[in-house]
């Protein structure tokens, strides 16, 4: 796992950022010393987020970060994403199929169907009827 993180920094010349990523995303500390091939889906997702943070992005793009992850780990990832975005001032672009997870993290939403935007707005105003209508298209 540590080698995986170091490889993400090649060309960036900032090995000290691994320590920064471990501080920001403590779940990674428990993965150090393990082989990547034995990580669970949730652990792999945590490693992927940690790698993304190493480059200090302005936008963190997450595609289905809860896919195949145990509910207990989903809450850890959600808390970490929220905290990291706040501490680093990151914008988070989230592609997510689970509405409850997306609602808790997002300020705004866009619903797409067949490659087109079919609904958009402020998450606090998102109505279940809107989602159900577009899911049935």
List each language-model region with its residue ranges.
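ABC-type ATPase nucleotide-binding domains, specifically the catalytic core motifs of the NBD
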Residues: 1-18, 25-29, 121
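H-loop/switch region of ABC-family ATPase nucleotide-binding domains
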Residues: 96-97
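Conserved catalytic motifs of ABC-family nucleotide-binding domains
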Residues: 56
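Helical segment within the ABC ATPase nucleotide-binding domain
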Residues: 75-88
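Catalytic Walker B motif of ABC-type/P-loop ATPase nucleotide-binding domains
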Residues: 60-64
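ABC ATPase C-loop
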Residues: 52-53
